[in-house]
C-alpha cells in the first residue's frame, strides 16, 4: 500500500467521500450503515471517562498547589464565558443583518411537529437544579457509567486533591494512574484504526436519510451559519490565537486528522482524547490540558452558541414573530445559561434550542420543525467550531500560566515535531507509547 494511504488523514477523507456517494446513490443502504458510525462513537466514548479521570488526577496532584488549580480553572471559566457570549452576539448580529427567514410567512400551526417530540420532551424534563444535581454522581463508580463529562471531572478533581494530601502513598497511587492512562491511550490507538469505517457509515447514513436535496433546502440559513462559523474561527479565534503567540491556520493544520473525525461523526467529543494528546505533545502542560479541555466541552461550545442564536432568530423571522431589542436581550440572557449545558455530542444543540425556546416563550417551539431536516448538516459546523474553540482556549489559558513551551509549540505547529502516537505508526506495534510521568518518586 502506498505510504500516503496509510495516513489516517487520507483514509478519513476517502471514507467521507465514499460515504456521500453511497448515501446519494443507494439511500436505503446508506441508512442501514448508521450502526458503523454509532459503534465508532460508542467506542470513543468508552475511553473518554478514564482518560479524563487519569489526566485530571495526574495534573491536579502534580500541581501540589490548590491555588494554582483554582487559578487555572477560574481563568478558563472567564475565557469560556467571554468568548461564548461573543459567539452568541455574533450569531444574533448576522441574523439581524441577513434575515434569511424573512418572507417565509410560515404559520406554526401548519407545521408537522411529530419529529420534535423527543427533543422537546428531553428539554422539558430538565430544570436548572436538575443540571446542577447531574454534576454530582450517585456514587464514585456511577460517574464513569453515566456518559457525562462533568461528574467525571468532579470526581477526578476530588481524587487529585486527596492524593496531594496523602504524601508518599499518594505518589504510589499516582504512578499507577499514570500507567493506567498509558494503557488507555494504547486502546485508543486500536480504536482509531476504525475511524475511516465510522466516518464512512455516519456520512452514508446522513446523506441516505436526508438526501442531497436537504443540503440545498433552506440553503440561505445553512450558508449564513457556515459563513458565520468561518468568520468566528478565522477572525475572532484567529485574533485571540495571534495575541497568544500562535497561528490559527497552523493550529488547524496540526489537528486536521481530528477535525476530519469530527466532520465524519458530527461529534466534537469523538476526537477529545486525541486533542488532549496533541496539545500535550505541542508543549502545553498536562495539568492545564486536563482541566481546560474537559471543562470546555460543557462550557465552551462556540459553534453551538452561534447556532442557537441564529436558529432562534430564523424561526422568529420565518413565523413573523416580532422580536425587539428587549426580547432579543432576554433571549441572549437565557442562552447564556442554556448554552452551557449542551454536550459536544450529536443532537445536543437541537435539544438545547428546544429548552431555550420553551424558556423564552416569545418564539414558537413548533417552528423548530422548519430546521429539523437540515439540523444534521449544520451539526458538522457546530462540532468543528466547538472543537477548534476548545483547542484555542487550552493554549490561551496555558500561555497565560506560562504553562506552554512556546518553542515546542512552534515546532509542532510548523510540522517539525509531530506526535509519534498515531494509530498507524510502527512504534505502537513495538510497544512504545506515552511516557509514564515518574517525576514523583515511588517509595
Curated annotation (Swiss-Prot):
SUPFAM superfamilies: Proton glutamate symport protein. One of its GO terms (molecular function) is malate:proton symporter activity. It is found in: Cell membrane. InterPro entries: C4_dicarb_transport, Na-dicarboxylate_symporter, Na-dicarboxylate_symporter_CS, Na:dicarbo_symporter_sf. Residues 415-443 are annotated as: Disordered. Keywords: Cell membrane, Membrane, Symport, Transmembrane, Transmembrane helix, Transport. Pfam families: SDF. It is a multi-pass membrane protein. Residues 427-443 have a biased composition (Basic and acidic residues). One of its GO terms (cellular component) is plasma membrane. GO terms for biological process: L-aspartate transmembrane transport. Responsible for the transport of dicarboxylates such as succinate, fumarate, and malate across the membrane. Belongs to the dicarboxylate/amino acid:cation symporter (DAACS) (TC 2.A.23) family. PANTHER family: AEROBIC C4-DICARBOXYLATE TRANSPORT PROTEIN, PROTON/GLUTAMATE-ASPARTATE SYMPORTER. NCBIfam families: PRK01663.1 (NF002461), PRK13027.1 (NF009587). This is C4-dicarboxylate transport protein.
Amino acid at each position: 500500500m502506498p505510504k500516503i494511504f496509510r495516513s489516517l488523514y487520507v483514509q478519513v477523507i476517502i471514507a467521507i467521500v465514499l460515504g456521500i456517494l453511497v448515501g446519494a446513490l443507494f439511500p436505503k443502504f446508506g441508512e442501514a450503515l448508521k450502526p458503523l458510525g454509532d459503534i465508532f462513537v460508542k467506542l470513543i466514548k468508552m475511553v473518554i471517562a478514564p482518560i479524563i479521570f487519569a489526566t485530571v488526577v495526574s495534573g491536579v496532584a502534580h500541581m501540589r498547589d490548590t491555588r494554582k488549580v483554582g487559578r487555572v480553572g477560574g481563568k478558563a471559566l472567564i475565557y469560556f464565558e467571554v468568548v461564548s457570549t461573543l459567539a452568541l452576539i455574533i450569531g444574533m448580529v448576522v441574523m439581524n443583518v441577513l434575515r434569511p427567514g424573512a418572507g417565509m410567512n410560515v404559520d406554526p400551526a401548519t407545521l408537522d411537529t411529530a419529529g420534535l417530540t423527543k427533543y422537546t420532551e428531553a428539554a422539558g424534563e430538565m430544570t436548572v437544579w436538575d443540571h446542577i444535581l447531574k454534576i454530582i454522581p450517585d456514587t464514585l463508580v456511577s460517574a464513569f457509567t453515566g456518559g457525562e463529562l462533568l461528574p467525571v471531572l468532579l470526581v477526578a478533581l476530588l481524587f487529585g486533591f486527596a492524593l496531594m494530601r496523602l504524601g508518599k502513598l499518594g505518589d504510589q497511587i499516582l504512578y499507577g494512574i499514570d500507567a493506567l492512562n498509558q494503557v488507555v491511550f494504547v486502546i485508543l490507538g486500536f480504536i482509531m484504526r476504525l475511524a475511516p469505517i465510522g466516518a464512512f457509515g455516519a456520512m452514508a447514513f446522513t446523506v441516505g436519510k436526508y438526501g442531497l436535496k436537504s443540503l440545498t433546502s433552506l440553503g440561505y440559513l445553512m450558508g449564513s451559519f457556515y459563513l458565520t462559523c468561518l468568520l468566528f474561527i478565522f477572525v475572532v479565534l484567529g485574533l485571540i490565537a495571534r495575541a497568544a503567540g500562535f497561528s490559527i491556520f497552523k493550529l488547524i493544520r496540526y489537528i486536521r486528522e481530528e477535525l476530519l473525525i469530527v466532520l465524519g461523526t458530527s461529534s466534537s467529543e469523538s476526537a477529545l482524547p486525541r486533542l488532549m494528546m496533541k496539545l500535550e505533545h505541542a508543549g502545553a502542560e498536562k495539568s492545564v490540558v486536563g482541566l481546560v479541555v474537559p471543562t470546555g466541552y460543557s462550557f465552551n461550545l462556540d459553534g453551538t452558541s452561534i447556532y442557537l442564536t441564529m436558529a432562534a432568530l430564523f424561526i422568529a423571522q420565518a413565523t413573523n414573530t416580532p422580536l425587539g431589542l428587549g426580547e432579543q436581550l432576554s433571549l441572549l440572557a437565557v442562552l447564556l445559561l442554556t448554552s452551557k449545558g449542551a454536550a459536544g455530542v450529536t443532537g445536543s444543540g437541537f435539544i438545547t434550542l428546544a429548552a431555550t425556546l420553551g424558556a423564552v416563550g416569545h418564539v414558537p417551539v413548533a417552528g423548530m420543525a422548519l430546521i429539523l431536516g437540515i439540523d444534521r448538516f449544520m451539526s458538522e459546523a457546530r462540532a468543528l467550531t466547538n472543537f477548534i474553540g476548545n483547542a484555542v482556549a487550552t493554549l490561551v489559558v496555558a500561555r497565560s500560566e506560562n504553562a506552554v513551551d512556546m518553542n515546542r509549540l512552534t515546532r509542532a505547529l510548523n510540522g517539525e515535531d509531530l506526535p509519534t502516537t498515531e494509530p498507524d505508526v510502527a512504534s505502537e506495534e513495538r510497544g512504545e507509547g506515552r511516557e509514564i510521568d515518574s517525576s514523583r518518586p515511588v517509595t
